[in-house]
Amino acid sequence: MKLDILAFGAHPDDVELGAAGTIAKEISLGRSVGIIDLTQGELGTRGSAEIRHQEATKAKELLGITIRENLKFRDGFFINNEAHQMEIIKKIRQYQPEIVLCNAVDDRHIDHGKGSKLVSDACFLSGLRRIETTLDGVAQAAWRPKVVYHYIQWKNIVPDFVVDITGFMEAKMNAVLAYSSQFYDSNSNEPTTPISDKNFLDSVTYRARDLGRLIGTDFAEGFTCERVPAVESLFNLK
């Protein structure tokens, strides 16, 4: 199965918080999108691996994602080495995405930066034909995505470009709210975390609104990229 976009997140909810509006918009345009979570988020202060799996499944259904998988790397302790790279290479070759989305290059949670570099390195290595992989006993062809884009998360990283998600902010927040174990709940007895603070979800909306303000729209999501972005014409710029 070939996908147009394959989004990776170190934890379930990373992709939704960083790029769900963009994903919803691309799906509305007929693009196929998949999400692969690197870990189950089992070290998270709130919820559990089982609960987060259920929440990820709900978010998948809300967004209309084609596939969602979890590589079950060790939360907090996965590293950028050959074994982990090979698992991601197999997925890239299986789904042959044109575009890969992944974690912010630098962020509060150490897994985000680690995951970002791991996925980026795997995208490059996946294009080398002398690295051999198989799927169900059949050799996989080398495949390198055209581009890797990093969504912005906790830190206020200056984006290289932004995507207008006006009209898709509700879809984004519905997908985010699928992860109810992670966010503010006045009835919860679990410890408070930076994202379970009662003001956190408002900050997600405020950031999208501020990025939208920069381009004269209601809402936007920001991304950084590893090469200079190009447009076919000056008139393609908003």
Region annotations inferred by a language model:
Residues K2-L6, E82-K238:
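Metal-dependent de-N-acetylase/amidase catalytic core
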Residues M1-Y95, T224, L234-N236:
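Active-site rim/loop-helix segments in enzyme catalytic domains that contact anionic ligands
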